[in-house]
Amino acid sequence: FLHRKEVVIIPSLEKDITGHADNMVRFLDGQTVVCVESDSIGRQLQTILQYHGLDVLEFPSAPDEDRSGVRSYLNYLETDEAVFLPVFGIDTDTKAIAAAEKLFSKPVEPVMIPHLAADGSGLHSISWGMSW
């Protein structure tokens, strides 16, 4: 799928205590990544990833004043049947759902996770170790 021969070091979100890159950037295929919108960290990510030859698409993020390292729409869970998109009960949820519906050809299922996010995780992160 990736067939990459290099490791790219990326910055972390200031409030992120987990160090999970899946809060900021996700591979869609071997050449294309989706990353948080062009806030400060998003611009750094885009520059780094484009320098390494990747195509970069932007995805909405929660407002800066509300976002922690785990309040991320990019920490979605993708299965063969659907994309489960984390939402938080905030205004930008609608924008993120619309963006996901354009990005993926399978159904997008919003999942309210404010308590899960507050505890330091997201949908993709909690799925590690599960067999699909």
Language-model-derived ranges and their functions:
Residues 1-132:
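Histidine/cysteine-enriched polar flanking segments
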